[in-house]
């Protein structure tokens, strides 16, 4: 049984891509078959996994979705790249921006990505979708096929306030398109545990959302290393396996596995 998790927040810079890659590789280290989908036109996930020029790739999520719209048949492994740390990747690039515009005129436009996932999900235990920092049509496609949504939130006051709109959108998709959709949990990222501020934000999250939404027990500490690994094309487990960020993502992986 494949579980599909969208990693989403309409605010950028909150650790979505880092969380997608390190959670995905963490799951693979536990013996799970994992597909990561880069659903962001910036191609940040693709680049961070070592495919440093995503805009030069000819087979990407945009071409997959265009093929589905145009009824073009594809092999199951069309476009999939394999990473040395045991995960598969469906890359994304700038072509997703153009596709998002063209989706407006497509019948069942919210369900194009779901058609692709139905085709490949038998081969995986987990599919993680790195969403773009907006609530546009590509992100709605991700929500329409996900079982759950994991929301990374930077430990700062304003991003926490922005959660309200995202949670409302998730509720709307659940009512209108995807009744099985749930929130996997809220993950605090870039936490500086030396400050009281981070503790205040954590308390604010629990106060506002704790009764409705799971707040992950583990949070991701702020770290220069997390930024460095994007340039190396490897996960935190390979770059700094004994560090606090690797330990935090390992704990997050165990929490997600415990939520199966």
Regions found by a protein language model. Name each.
Residues 1-260:
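P-loop NTP-binding core
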